[in-house]
Amino acid sequence: TIVYSGEVEHRDSTGRGGVIGPGDVQWMTAGAGILHEEFHSSAFSQKGGELKMMQLWVNLPAKDKMATPGYQSITQSDIPVVTLPDNSGTLRVIAGRFGEVTGPAHTFSPLNVWDLALRQGSHLTLNQPEGWSTALVVVEGSVTVNGTTPAGEAQLVVLSQSGDKLHLEASSDAKVLLMAGEPLNEPIVGYGPFVMNSKTEIAEAIRDFNSGRFGQI
């Protein structure tokens, strides 16, 4: 969960939790099973205001589906910021790598999560690993992707897995969240909040939940 404005409070069955605000990230690993809840912080609920956040679900490899549940509270100061060429803007490395810079989020498979702030009129070319799945969400403003695809606020652009370059042109000041990962090429079965690799595993997850193996909040 990435917060752009407002505050989010979290707690879960590992005993972890806390409040995150603008620029902060919470990175939770469900693994073998976790109970959690997210809500406005008490202080934010009392004063009111805009809450803008992005939540991503990253599929774990089959071999890691039963990993120990975990939680990372990543503050804005923990996230490295890269100044982009030609005064184009900045890029925050939340997960994965950008050049020699590594993000703080712990991942189980190769992936990148980059939070970009682009200046109006800027042109930017980003290297992307050949064959990876790549998508971007325009959080604010508008951009043109690869010279042909305009995208405005709250729009998602899914890119082809072929090619290793991504070109962005900012039509206005813009915030863009870019997500890219190496395909797992494994079956996916989802049911409610459960995501596994087979119907049998889904049934096992439901039994674990009903028997209290996910713990308590």
Task: Please report, for each region that a protein language model flagged, where it lies by residue.
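Jelly-roll (double-stranded beta-helix
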Residues: T1-I217
